[in-house]
A protein has these predicted regions:
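Extracellular beta-strand-rich recognition modules
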Residues: 744-750, 832, 869-875
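Glycine/proline-rich low-complexity spacer/linker segments in large multi-domain proteins
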Residues: 98-109, 627-639, 751-797, 876-934
Length: 934
């Protein structure tokens, strides 16, 4: 168990405890995307910067764009530099165990041996026997019969075993051993003294059997016969038949596949790490729903048994966490693991705000997550970096001054969660085993509808009734389960009631344990589908509900809570309550006793109460009997004022359209990524002149920022350019230039030489994610950025016009990225709450010497004396309107990936792509009003 360093004070409240505690072990870490040619000084500088932002460590992560050869001596030298600097800074380092993802193939090296490649099955109905097939069947009245060569049938139901040239067979222990030898061992050979110190351990990412078809392994056949005493091929056709007689085979098959997944991959890594004095963390693939857990390992919960710090991921703004985070939080509670990691914020887009990031984290921490791995901190935004599943943290983030506050918040919340135990009297048996009944990889509809949709209704009922519970996974129950005095025990946890949640299928062990529990007077509820199968066989299951779902026990301190919440107890007996409201309306909470609300952002506690209103998209943290005297804010009056626009940082124009002249004399023009894909698909090799143009209404000074690429002959309006290093990115350069009235042109020469290789990796439909994730290339035509004192007008720049409150993107600040200032005057006295109305990432309110920020919540508060007060409001944008994506037709709320920018694969020519819209889609920015409550 991780121990924090703290001073002992007998009568302290939670805020005092946090102040007296070293929270470093609970501070967020980041995926540090090392995606360029690595330089020692820059590595050290970025680590120091991260430390100043309140981060506790990094995951050192090779990603697309990196040109330092992976696992080369240069690579290990840079790893050593980073470990040395991290040690000096007191930061933790996790080594990501792959180049790209998923983990296991050593950046593609293990694929050279065909025996290592991932296996999968394909099914065809044929008119003749194919001796090259893996298995051939007749199908008589729905019953498959394995055919030998020479036997006849009306139709030949044929199964082929295929192999993937893009990923490895991680269920094969020999492959995992090669992976360890090629990846883990070299780190130990070089850095053994740092293991268990600054090199905390390894992060393994999305290991999976072949996810794009029905999976199998080279060892499945032998292991199936060894486990069940049956021939695998006798029933293999059932993996493709949607009927009840297939259930027993599918239950056996996917239980075996999950065991091979856990024992032959996770456990081998886990055992190696424990033997070498370090830890294992990382996550499986697609933990969000029960049916999607079939895409990687046929059940995620069991993998958490073989990690020191079990982990999940939660992508995009609105990905639900009710299954993934509750699943992992429950197993961690049952196994006594007090650190639970989430890889989070990836794909949430450049438009995501600190308030949205806080909610993304809160909705996972409420279920037991307590350590955050933030996705992503780019070594460089150049090339693939800026489109790599944003958001991206670092110096280019306009609200970077508030980033430490975000990290301080989650360090404090993580400490509280990790140091406490949840009061959860109910065990909810999940329907993971039921997924196997109807699961067909190429038609998941039945599994989704029969399992996940029904379970969602049960989860909603539990939430409405304020039931506090843990999940119980039946495979975990097999290993850790028991009964005691009418209670169910799982590892170190005891549950006084059990709910079967939409479980059509149960393991025989589960039926036995619950039978024992009920016989001893235990409480059992059933919701959703009732159990009808045991180990896949239709059975009159001898379990009867003796309590209604709504009557399940809940903590006595909770009277009414229609939200996700956790009531937790610290070792010294102090309790706290944490609830999260993902809804669009405020929600009411009623507790029994006195609970003092705490604001972790400001470090304030307020007088105890028992009834609370949790704001929309907000959360509540309250300490039982907290010793705080300050009353909670109550407003007698609210006024709304329209602020006056004062000024702004330099404006920006993003130029993303290019004209490319080829050696043949042909010219292509349009969106840079469309032009690039068109050239690559043609297989073009040769020189080209790349031109960016924009118009200006008058001569004016500008600053041009471009990426460092292997180009030559750079000119602006025909004159050579004297670039200098940009302060915002190691691979950006800038130049002060004089734009002229009319058209202005930035141009250079480049040469495409690798079109065939790029085409093969990026645009062949058969090439999966794994190979693209570790592929580095240069387009030679990335967007460029014009900064200066101007307004944006169409594709050009013009004289600044007066600005007013409202959306500034409609007032000539289309691509603005930075801070603007407003002012207003108000008469108020005492405690004042200031709520910015509009679109922003962070708002700083300045009144004389007083400062307060609206960052993680929607308001700022400050104490004012009597009279009129002049306020300055510093309002920060996100990075979205500078970096995009601008032309993607989809809604970004579902997640943003590189394809959202490049629209990869869809270009029929440089102008035509069904995913492309020629309009430039922007996100509103600016304040329309400020509400003042006092």
């Amino acid at each position: 168990m991780v121990q924090s360093m703290r001073k002992e004070t007998k009568t302290e409240n939670l805020l005092q405890t946090l102040k007296n505690t070293d929270l470093n072990a609970f501070r967020p870490v980041v995926f540090w995307s090392v995606n360029s040619c690595l330089q020692e000084d820059e590595l050290r500088r970025q680590l120091r910067e991260m430390k100043s932002f309140g981060l506790g460590g990094i995951v050192f992560h090779a990603r697309a764009g990196m040109t330092t050869p992976y696992l080369s001596e240069d690579w290990f030298r840079m790893v050593g530099v980073s470990l040395e600097e991290a040690a000096a800074l007191g930061m933790q380092v996790w080594m990501y165990d792959e180049f790209g993802w998923p983990s296991g193939f050593v950046g593609g090296r293990l694929l050279a041996d065909e025996a290592n490649r991932a296996r999968y099955l394909e099914y065809e109905v044929k008119d003749s026997f194919d001796a090259q097939a893996y298995a051939v069947y007749s199908l008589d009245e729905g019953v498959p019969r394995l055919l030998r060569q020479g036997e006849t049938a009306q139709k030949y139901h044929t199964i082929y075993m295929r192999s993937s040239d893009a990923y490895v067979d991680i269920l094969n222990p020999a492959v995992t051993e090669q992976f360890i030898a090629a990846t883990y061992e070299p780190y130990y050979e070089r850095f053994a003294p740092r293991f268990g110190r600054e090199l905390v351990g390894f992060f393994t990412d999305e290991p999976q059997y072949y996810r794009y078809a029905t999976p199998i392994s080279a060892v499945t056949e032998e292991e199936f016969e060894k486990t069940y005493g049956e021939e695998l091929k006798s029933g293999l056709l059932y993996l493709f038949l949607q009927e009840e007689r297939a259930y027993p085979f599918r239950v056996k098959y996917y239980n075996l596949m999950n065991r091979l997944y856990c024992e032959n991959f996770y456990k081998k890594l886990y055992d190696w790490c424990r033997a070498h004095g370090c830890k294992l963390t990382g996550h499986s693939v697609e933990e969000t729903f029960f049916f999607t857990q079939m895409w990687g390992g046929a059940d995620c919960a069991t993998s958490y048994l073989y990690e020191d710090v079990p982990a999940i991921d939660n992508l995009a703004k609105y990905s639900p966490a009710g299954i993934s985070a509750k699943n992992i939080g429950s197993v961690a509670a049952q196994t006594g693991k007090n650190l639970v990691m989430t890889e989070t914020f990836g794909c949430s887009s450049y438009s995501v705000t600190p308030r949205e990031l806080r909610l993304i984290g809160d909705k996972q921490y409420v279920f037991g997550v307590d350590l955050m791995c933030q996705h992503l901190y780019n070594y460089s935004l150049a090339g693939q970096g800026k489109i790599d599943h944003p958001v991206s943290f670092g110096r280019t983030l306009p609200w970077i001054e508030g980033y430490k506050t975000l990290n301080d918040y989650f360090a404090a919340l993580g400490y509280l969660i990790a140091s406490s135990q949840e009061e959860a009297p109910v065990a909810v048996v999940t329907p993971m085993e039921s997924v196997y009944l109807d699961y067909l990889r190429l038609d998941e509809t039945a599994a989704r509808e029969n399992v996940d949709i029904g379970f969602a209704a049960v989860a909603d009922e539990l939430r409405r009734n304020g039931i506090a519970y843990h999940f119980v996974n039946e495979k975990v129950l097999e290993k850790l389960g028991g009964t005691s005095d009418g209670n169910l025990t799982v590892g170190g946890r005891t549950y006084s009631a059990v709910l079967l949640a939409n479980c059509r299928e149960l393991k025989g062990n589960t039926v036995r344990l619950l039978g024992e529990m009920c016989a001893a007077g235990g409480k059992l509820a059933v919701a959703g589908a009732k159990p009808a199968y045991v180990d896949g066989i239709r059975t009159d299951v001898p379990l009867r509900a003796n309590i209604e779902c709504k009557d399940l026990p809940k903590p006595a301190a909770v009277r009414a809570a229609g939200l996700d919440y956790t009531l937790r107890r610290l070792p010294d007996g102090r309790r706290f309550f944490f609830a999260v409201n993902e809804g669009d309306e405020p929600a009411r909470i009623e507790l029994s006793g006195d609970f003092a609300p705490i604001n972790l952002e400001t470090g304030e506690g307020f007088a105890p109460q028992s009834v609370f209103e949790v704001p929309a998209h907000g959360s509540l943290l309250a300490e039982e009997n907290g010793s705080y005297a300050q009353p909670a804010f109550r407003a007698a009056k609210t006024v709304s004022l329209v602020p006056q626009f004062v000024g702004a940082a330099p404006n920006c124009l993003t130029v993303e359209n290019v004209k490319v002249a080829l050696e043949s004399g042909e010219t292509l023009h349009g969106y840079a990524y469309g032009v690039y894909e068109t050239l690559i698909k043609r297989g073009y090799k040769g020189k080209m002149r790349v031109t960016y143009a924009f118009f200006s209404d008058a001569a004016r000074e500008i600053e041009l920022t471009a990426e460092k690429q292997k180009v030559r002959g750079e000119r602006f309006n025909g004159e050579p350019i004297a670039f200098v290093q940009s302060e915002e990115d190691i691979n950006f350069k800038k130049a002060r230039l004089q734009a002229k009235a009319g058209e202005n042109v930035y141009e250079y020469e480049a040469e495409l030489a690798d079109a065939e290789q790029v085409r093969g990796v990026l645009f062949e439909a058969s090439v999966p994610e794994s190979l693209r994730n570790c592929f580095s290339y240069s387009t030679y035509m990335e967007p460029v950025y014009i900064a200066g004192d101007f307004d944006v007008k169409g594709d050009g720049i013009a004289a600044k016009q007066p600005k007013s409150a409202g959306d500034l993107t409609a007032q000539g600040m289309d691509n603005f990225c930075g801070a603007v200032e407003y002012s207003f005057t108000a008469e108020a006295e005492g405690r004042v709450r200031l709520r910015p109305v509009g679109n922003y990432s962070m708002c700083e309110f300045i009144c004389g010497e007083k400062r307060a920020a609206a960052l993680l919540g929607g308001c700022a508060e400050m104490e004012l004396g009597k009279g009129a007060h002049a306020f300055t409001v510093r309002c920060y944008s996100t990075m979205r309107n500078r970096f995009g994506p601008f032309h993607w037709v989809q809604n970004e709320d579902g997640g943003v990936s590189p394809d959202s920018f490049t629209l990869r694969g869809g270009w029929t020519d440089e102008h035509t792509n069904p995913g492309y819209t020629p309009e430039r889609r922007l996100v509103p920015f600016g304040l329309s009003a400020v509400e003042i409550s006092f």
